């Protein structure tokens, strides 16, 4: 999973598009409802789940920061972002989406809530140029469905 995410982040020039492509990998790994490995770990093996959560940030944090810096350099993200802070906020928020007590799988589709979260996150950090790209990208996604 880590290698796939790093490959996506490295191969796609636009960090907004790369984040949505990374989301596809996350949804595939998280799976749907009770069958997802994340759900099983959180429910039946909470100690193992807690340990995995600790390792996530170290595994993906640097790649995420590089993507933020790429977006800042290209004018898609605001130039004054604190990349460490944004990384921590993003990962904490993403973890919250996977909390089965906050978002019970029988009530929430993981694909939809991750899309909403990414949109929420991006709107907080994009420039006018980035917002235009985001809105166009979202329109294209709607037209594909």
Segments and roles (model prediction):
Residues 6-10, 35-41, 73-76, 99-106, ...:
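Short, flexible helix-adjacent loops and helix caps
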Residues 21, 25, 51, 63-66, ...:
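Alpha-helical elements of Rossmann-like donor-binding domains used by nucleotide-donor carbohydrate transfer enzymes
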Residues 5-6, 38-47, 136-140:
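Short linear capping/connector segments at secondary-structure termini
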Residues 1, 5, 26, 30, ...:
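Hydrophobic recognition helices of helix-based DNA-binding modules
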Residues 3-36, 87-90:
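Hydrophobic alpha-helical connector segments
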Residues 66-74, 104-145:
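C-terminal peripheral helix-coil segments that are non-catalytic and often amphipathic
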Residues 27-65, 69-81, 85:
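Short secondary-structure transition hinges
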Residues 16-17, 55-56, 73-89, 107-112, ...:
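All-alpha amphipathic helical-bundle segments outside canonical DNA-binding/catalytic cores
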